[in-house]
């Protein structure tokens, strides 16, 4: 089921691609950028990217307007997402990142709801089965990347609802 994406009105407004100097205006602008990034990545199920890929992506590059958010401004938007818990840098140079349109705790809650709803408590799953198995095809976490899945399962492990284990063909998880 593909969701359609509608660009927000700001995306068609050239000044949106220049961070504004006024503090209040800039805060609203950053909030709009953060919302756009999360919505775009959620729709495209995109969870990791480099800053250079981001700059060339339609997300920060409006070809029709011939406007592109500069790399320094993209870094500011990404840092704002990090402060909100929606982004994690994958390297110390801050050139690649994991984008989390849902925080790990939220993914964990969704996964655990499915486990409980489908009577799978006390069951063991491989990570592959959980995100790529037939049983989860209709779930939002189907197709979730392994890095985000592990963070979600670690959140569940802290709540004593799951335990990440080693199984014959890699890692797995047991739900309680």
From Swiss-Prot:
Keyword terms of this UniProt record: Cytoplasm, Endosome, Membrane, Nucleus, Protein transport, Transcription, Transcription regulation, Transport
One GO-annotated biological process of the protein: protein transport to vacuole involved in ubiquitin-dependent protein catabolic process via the multivesicular body sorting pathway
Gene Ontology CC: ESCRT II complex; nucleus
Subcellular location: Cytoplasm; Endosome membrane; Nucleus
Pfam families reported in the protein's UniProt record: ESCRT-II
GO molecular function: protein homodimerization activity; structural molecule activity
InterPro entries per the UniProt record, alphabetical: ESCRT-II_cplx_Vps25-sub (IPR008570), ESCRT-II_cplx_Vps25-sub_N (IPR014041), WH-like_DNA-bd_sf (IPR036388), WH_DNA-bd_sf (IPR036390)
Domain of life: Eukaryota
Its job: Component of the ESCRT-II complex (endosomal sorting complex required for transport II), which is required for multivesicular body (MVB) formation and sorting of endosomal cargo proteins into MVBs. The MVB pathway mediates delivery of transmembrane proteins into the lumen of the lysosome for degradation. The ESCRT-II complex is probably involved in the recruitment of the ESCRT-III complex. The ESCRT-II complex may also play a role in transcription regulation, possibly via its interaction with ELL.
Subunit structure: Component of a complex at least composed of ELL, SNF8/EAP30, VPS25/EAP20 and VPS36/EAP45. Component of the ESCRT-II complex (endosomal sorting complex required for transport II), composed of SNF8, VPS36 and 2 copies of VPS25. Interacts with CFTR; the interaction requires misfolded CFTR. Interacts with the ESCRT-III subunit CHMP6 (via N-terminal half).
Family indicated by similarity: Belongs to the VPS25 family.
Entry protein name: Vacuolar protein-sorting-associated protein 25
Encoding gene, per UniProt annotation: VPS25
């Amino acid at each position: 089921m593909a969701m359609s994406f509608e660009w927000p009105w700001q995306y068609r407004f050239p000044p949106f691609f220049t961070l504004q100097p006024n503090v209040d205006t800039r805060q609203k602008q950053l909030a709009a950028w953060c919302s756009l990034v999360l919505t775009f990545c959620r729709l495209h199920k995109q969870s990791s990217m480099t800053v250079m890929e981001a700059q060339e992506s339609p997300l920060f590059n409006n070809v029709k307007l011939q406007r592109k958010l500069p790399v320094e401004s993209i870094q500011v938007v990404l840092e704002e997402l990090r402060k909100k818990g929606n982004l994690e840098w994958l390297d110390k140079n801050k050139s690649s990142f994991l984008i989390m349109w849902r925080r790990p705790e939220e993914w964990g809650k969704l996964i655990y709801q499915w486990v409980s709803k489908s009577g799978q408590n006390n069951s063991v799953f491989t990570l592959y089965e959980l995100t790529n198995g037939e049983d989860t095809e209709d779930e939002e976490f189907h197709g979730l990347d392994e890095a985000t899945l592990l963070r979600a399962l670690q959140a569940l492990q802290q709540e004593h609802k799951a335990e990440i284990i080693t199984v014959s063909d890699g890692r797995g998880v047991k739900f309680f």
